[in-house]
Amino acid sequence: MPKMKTKSGLKKRIKITATGKVKRGNAYRSHLAQNKTTKQKRQSRKSSQLSHSDFKRYKELI
């Protein structure tokens, strides 16, 4: 049976680190920023890691 294709939408949104962890960007940044606090906007600039339970689901898509 052939390999499954990688989901290209996911491929553009995540990076896999050298240790095998998955980095992702944060949501809620594209618009309506005036309703969010400065702290929310500042913290959402940082990238975060995908949780272990989510990684199990995403592994099939990668």
Curated annotation (Swiss-Prot):
Pfam families: Ribosomal_L35p
Residue spans of biased composition, Basic residues class: 1-26
Record GO biological process: translation
Basic and acidic residues: bias regions: 53-62
Keywords associated with the record: Ribonucleoprotein, Ribosomal protein
Position of the signal peptide: none
An annotated Gene Ontology molecular function: structural constituent of ribosome
PROSITE patterns: RIBOSOMAL_L35
Gene Ontology CC, one term: cytosolic large ribosomal subunit
NCBIfam families: rpmI_bact (TIGR00001)
Protein name: Large ribosomal subunit protein bL35
Organism: Metamycoplasma arthritidis (strain 158L3-1)
Gene responsible for this protein: rpmI
